[in-house]
């Protein structure tokens, strides 16, 4: 339990794996477990989307949101980009499931819960792929394992 009464977040990293915490990039030199005892903004390396992977509207939105987490110096610019993209998506997407998720994402980001917004966006990748006639993306096993460990 953390000092503020919330449960601690436990993370397990493999040797060489990186994690972004409050804008800092940390690399584990060996297998390690971390316990976050207070509110911290973090993103696991396998959830970091690279620019070349922003091939769909939701992935582009995810990238803008992730930049708010991992580049604090660019937070305002990333938020502005995110807001513009989100506004465009509300007029582009007609699918109720995605529109409801986008409304939730907007609310989460507005309340500073960017990590949860990222999870919500990722959860819509298969639906977006289906609507676009693309092969549904599969989350790597390692990412699934880490997500479960990070969110008991």
Swiss-Prot record:
Pfam families: FlbT. Disulfide bonds: none annotated. Keywords: Bacterial flagellum biogenesis, Repressor, RNA-binding. InterPro entries: Flagellum_FlbT (IPR009967). The keyword Repressor applies. GO terms for biological process: bacterial-type flagellum organization; mRNA catabolic process; negative regulation of bacterial-type flagellum assembly. Belongs to the FlbT family. Has a post-transcriptional repressor function in flagellum biogenesis. Associates with the 5'-UTR of fljK mRNA and promotes its degradation. This is Probable flagellum biosynthesis repressor protein FlbT.
């Amino acid at each position: 339990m953390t000092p503020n009464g919330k449960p601690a977040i436990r993370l397990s990293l493999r040797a060489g794996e990186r994690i972004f915490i409050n804008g800092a990039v940390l690399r584990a030199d060996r297998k390690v477990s971390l316990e976050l005892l207070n509110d911290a903004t973090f993103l696991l390396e396998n959830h970091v989307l690279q620019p070349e992977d922003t091939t769909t509207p939701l992935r582009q939105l995810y990238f803008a949101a992730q930049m708010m987490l991992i580049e604090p110096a660019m937070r305002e610019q990333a938020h502005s980009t995110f807001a513009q993209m989100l506004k465009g998506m509300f007029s582009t997407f007609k699918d109720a499931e995605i529109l409801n998720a986008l409304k939730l994402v907007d609310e989460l980001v507005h309340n500073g819960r960017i990590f949860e917004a990222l999870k919500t966006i990722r959860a819509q990748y298969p639906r977006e792929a289906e609507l676009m006639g693309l092969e549904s993306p599969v989350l790597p096993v390692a990412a699934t394992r880490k997500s479960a460990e990070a969110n008991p």
